[in-house]
Amino acid sequence: MDIRKFFGVIPSGKKLVSETVKKNEKTKSDEETLKAKKGIKEIKVNSSRKEDDFKQKQPSKKKRIIYDSDSESEETLQVKNAKKPPEKLPVSSKPGKISRQDPVTYISETDEEDDFMCKKAASKSKENGRSTNSHLGTSNMKKNEENTKTKNKPLSPIKLTPTSVLDYFGTGSVQRSNKKMVASKRKELSQNTDESGLNDEAIAKQLQLDEDAELERQLHEDEEFARTLAMLDEEPKTKKARKDTEAGETFSSVQANLSKAEKHKYPHKVKTAQVSDERKSYSPRKQSKYESSKESQQHSKSSADKIGEVSSPKASSKLAIMKRKEESSYKEIEPVASKRKENAIKLKGETKTPKKTKSSPAKKESVSPEDSEKKRTNYQAYRSYLNREGPKALGSKEIPKGAENCLEGLIFVITGVLESIERDEAKSLIERYGGKVTGNVSKKTNYLVMGRDSGQSKSDKAAALGTKIIDEDGLLNLIRTMPGKKSKYEIAVETEMKKESKLERTPQKNVQGKRKISPSKKESESKKSRPTSKRDSLAKTIKKETDVFWKSLDFKEQVAEETSGDSKARNLADDSSENKVENLLWVDKYKPTSLKTIIGQQGDQSCANKLLRWLRNWQKSSSEDKKHAAKFGKFSGKDDGSSFKAALLSGPPGVGKTTTASLVCQELGYSYVELNASDTRSKSSLKAIVAESLNNTSIKGFYSNGAASSVSTKHALIMDEVDGMAGNEDRGGIQELIGLIKHTKIPIICMCNDRNHPKIRSLVHYCFDLRFQRPRVEQIKGAMMSIAFKEGLKIPPPAMNEIILGANQDIRQVLHNLSMWCARSKALTYDQAKADSHRAKKDIKMGPFDVARKVFAAGEETAHMSLVDKSDLFFHDYSIAPLFVQENYIHVKPVAAGGDMKKHLMLLSRAADSICDGDLVDSQIRSKQNWSLLPAQAIYASVLPGELMRGYMTQFPTFPSWLGKHSSTGKHDRIVQDLALHMSLRTYSSKRTVNMDYLSLLRDALVQPLTSQGVDGVQDVVALMDTYYLMKEDFENIMEISSWGGKPSPFSKLDPKVKAAFTRAYNKEAHLTPYSLQAIKASRHSTSPSLDSEYNEELNEDDSQSDEKDQDAIETDAMIKKKTKSSKPSKPEKDKEPRKGKGKSSKK
C-alpha cells in the first residue's frame, strides 16, 4: 500500500468535517460518513467550490499539498505558506459578532473516527520529529487562507490545527480549548521560524506569545484556581451537585458561592484571588484574544468540560496535593466555622453550596481499599472469636465475698475471655452485689472488664468515652474493697410505708372526734371510692333505724347500748376481715384497685388509658357511626378506635389484661358480665347469655338510699381467652361473636394471648387492637420489693431480679412463687432464689423453627443444657421435629470442623447416619405402635445430629420439603390409578404400564395437533380423547404428571385462543364413557354368617334376581341422569288443588 494514499485521506476527511459543520447539521447522513472513510477518488468528487477556486490560483502546489514527500522543494514551499497566516491574523480579528455565525467548533465535540485519526496521526508525526514535513501543517495553512477570505474569527483556523502529544501530556497550562490553541500555534511558529532563518516579524510574534504563555502559567498556578478545577471535576459525580444543576444553577453561581465561603474560611487568600481576577479581566492582550470568543464559550460548556479533563501531569499532581491540603484544613477549621455559623445567621445561606460539594469526597472515601481491608479484618476477628479458646486457669483464683449491694448503681461491660472465671459466672457475680451487666459500651458505663482476645471496637469506644478499663483482678479487687449500700428499693418502700402510716393516723383522729360526717364530705368520699360510700350508706341507714327504734328509751341507756353494740360489731368485723385477708392469695390480696396501680400502664398512651378513652366515648361514637362498618375503622387516621364496637386486648399471660378491663368498667360505672374459658360459649349459649345480660341490673345498687340513681343501665361484655373458643362446646362461637359485634348495642371487650392464632385473624378486623407488652424488669422489681417489705420478707434485689426473669416477667407467676418460697422462712438468699427460679422456670411454648435453631445452636445458649434438656427439644413436636433436623443440618457450619472441609464432610456423614437410624426407629414406632421407643428416636433424630453439627446456621431454618413431596406423591398415585381405570378398555394394562409407557406418548399425541395446526387441530384432539375415554380433567392430569424436573407443561405454552377453542369444542359435545361419573351406591343388607348354607344360597339367588331387576330399572342406573323436579308446581296442579279443596268442603 502506498503511504501517500494513507496520508491523503486525512485532510479530505477534515474538509468534510468543516463542510458539514458549516451547514449547521446536527446529524450526518450515512452516505457522507461512508464517503469520508473511502478512497481518494470519492473525496475529490465531494470537494467544495472554494477548494476548486483555491486550486486554480495555485496550480503548481496541487499534488504536493495533498501528498507527503521528503524533498527539499516541498519544505521551502511549506515554510512560505507558514509565514502567511500570521500576517493576515490581525485583519480577521476585527469583527466581534462573527463568532456566533462561525460554524467551526472544537474537534473534541465530534465523535467521528476521522477526527480521532487526525489527532493520532499528528501526535505520531511530532514524536518522530517530522512535524514540519507533515501534510497536516500544509493542509491547515491552506484552510487559514480560506478563512481569511471569508473573514472569520482568528481562533477558528487554530481550533482545527493539529495537536501534539505535548499539548495533552506536556507542560501546557490547564485551560479551555482556546488556551491549547495558543500553545499549539506558538510551537508551530517556533518550528517554522527555525528553518526559515528566523524572520524578524515571526520572532516578535513568538516573543509576545511566550509572554502571554508565561502570564497564563503564573495566573493558573494559583491555589484558588486549582481548587475551582477540583470542584468542577467533583460536581457532576455527586448527587447534591445534580440537584443544583436541575434547579438551574450555573457554574458562575457555584463559583460565586465558593468565593463567599472562602472569604470566611480563608481570609488570607482572598487578596490573591482578587488580583488574579483583575489580571484576567484587565490584561489588554487577553481582552483582544478572548473578546470574540466570550459568547461561544458560554454556549460550549460540554466541550470545555471535556477539555478540562485533559491536563498535564504536573497540574494533576498539584490538584491532588491541593485536595489533601484542603481536607486537612477543613478538618481543622470546621469547629471554628460551626461557631461562626451560630453567631452569624445571615451567612448561613451563602455557605450552603460549598458544604454540598465538600460532603462528596467523604462519600467517595467510604468505598476505598481501606474500607475493604477493614471489612476483611473484621471478618477475620469474627472467625477468631468463633474459634477462640475458653478460660485457661478456671477456678485458680479465689472469689472474694463483698459487702451487700456494694456494686449497686454501677454498670459493667465484659469483653474477651477471663482466665479464671467464665463469662456467666462473672455476670452473676456482678449481679449478686447489685451491679448491672450490659452488652455495649455507652456513656453510662462505669467499668469495662477486659480479658484475653477482647473486642477492639469496645476498647476503642471505652478509651474515647473515658470509661475505666479493668481486668479480672481489678473486678475481684473492686468487690473486695467497695463498701456496702442500702438498696434503693428498700429506701423507696420505707418512705412509702411512712406516708401511708401518716395518712392512716389522721383519719382515725377525725373519726373519733367527729362521728357525724357533713354531707359535703359524704359526696367527696362517694366520688373517690365506691366501696367506702356503700359502707357509709349502709351505716347511715342502720343508724336511722336505730334512732327511730330507741326514741322512747332514756338517753343514757341509748348511748350505752349504742357504744357496746358498735364495739362488738367493730371487733367482729375486724376479726373476720383479718382472717379473710390472711387466707387470700397474694395475687388477690395485692391486686390493683385503680388504673394508676397497674404495673406498666401509667403512660398517657398506654393500653389502659386508650381503653378508658375508647369506652368513655363508646356511646357517642356508636350513635354517630351506626351505618359505618366496623372493619373500615382500620384505615381511619385516628388511633382512638372510635369506629370499632369492640376492643381486643392481646398479650402474654400475667401482664394485667383482665384487671385492666374490669377496672376500666368500674371507673366508668359499667356493670359487666365476664365469660372465660370455663364457660360454654357456643353459638346458642352466647345468644341466650348476652340477651339476658342486657336486661340485668346489679343487686348492689338497691342497698343504697338513692336506689334509682345508683342502679346502672350501662352494661359491658368481657370475653376472656377468646383464642380458647374451640371444640364441640364452643362450636360457631367466633362467628357468632363477630355477628354480635356487628349489631351490638353494648361495648364488648375481648382478650387473648396469641393474636396470630388462625381463629383470631377474622376477629381482629372488627376490634380496636390493643397489644399489651411485658413490663420491664425494673418496673416489676419495684412493686415486688414493696410487697415483700409489707410481708416482712428479706430478699436482696439481685435475687428478686432472678425470680422475675425466671417467671418470664409474668407478674402473677412472680407473686405465686414469692408466696410459696417464703412460706417457711422470711429470708431468701441470692443463690437460693436463683436455684429456685431456675427450677421453677416458666415453660415457654416454642415453635418448630425455634426448636430447629436451638438444636444446632452453639455458645452460651446451649452450653449448660443437659442431655434431658436436649432431648426435650425433640418432644416439643416429635412428629415434625425430625423432619426439621433433616432439612436444616446441611445448612450448619459446625464449630468442630474448624473450617476444614474434610472434617465438615465427615461430620455431615455421621449426622446423616444418625438421622437414618432415627428413621428406622420411627418406622418401628408407627408400624408396631411401640411408643416406648420415642426416647431412643429423640437421641438418634435430634440429640446426636445436634451435637455433631453444633455451630452456626447460615440461613433461617427452612420448612421440611418432604411434606410437600409426600403429598404430591399420593396425589400423583391417585391420578395414575384413575387414568388406568378410564383407559382400561383400550390399553388393557396396569397402573405401572400406563405411567411408564403410555403417558408420555399420549401427551405428545394430544398436544402436537394443537401446536402444529392451531384451532384446526382441536377436533383431532377431542376425537383422540373420546377414543381413550378421557375426560377434560384427565387431559389436565396427563399434562401435570408427564412434565418432569419442574418444567412447564407443553399445553401451557399454547396460544390462549387455541386453549379456549379446545375447551369450547369439548364442552359443546356429549361424551360417552364406559364408567360411572357418579359414586355408586353401596349394596343392600348382607345376611349373617350363622345361617345355613342352603338358606344363604336361596337368599343369594333372590338378591341376584332383585339386583338384575334393579339394573334393568332406569331409576337405579348410575349412567342415566334423572331430571330434577322443579320446585314450582305446574299449571294443571295449580288448577287441581283448589278443586280438591272445594270438593272436601262441599262434602263436609
Curated annotation (Swiss-Prot):
Q: Which Gene3D superfamilies match?
A: 1.10.8.60, 1.20.272.10, BRCT domain, P-loop containing nucleotide triphosphate hydrolases
What this protein is called in its record is Replication factor C subunit 1
Point out residues bearing the modification Phosphoserine: 69, 71, 73, 108, 156, 164, 173, 190, 253, 281, 283, 312, 368, 537, 1104, 1106
Tissue expression as described in the entry: Wide tissue distribution. Undetectable in placental tissue.
Please give the SMART domains that the UniProt record associates with this protein. Answer: AAA, BRCT
Quaternary structure annotation from Swiss-Prot or TrEMBL: Large subunit of the RFC complex, an heteropentameric complex consisting of RFC1 and four small subunits RFC2, RFC3, RFC4 and RFC5; the RFC complex interacts with PCNA and the interaction involves RFC1.
Biased composition range(s): Basic residues: 262-271
Where, by residue number, is the motif Nuclear localization signal? 1120-1124
Kindly state which keywords UniProt assigns to this record, in alphabetical order.
Answer: Activator, ATP-binding, DNA replication, DNA-binding, Isopeptide bond, Neuropathy, Nucleotide-binding, Nucleus, Phosphoprotein, Transcription, Transcription regulation, Ubl conjugation
Biased amino acid composition, Acidic residues: 1094-1105
- Enumerate the subcellular locations listed in this protein's record, separating them with semicolons: Nucleus
- Polar residues: compositionally biased ranges: 130-141
| Source organism per UniProt | Homo sapiens (Human)
| Region of interest (Disordered), ranges | 46-201, 228-380, 496-538, 1081-1148
The gene is RFC1
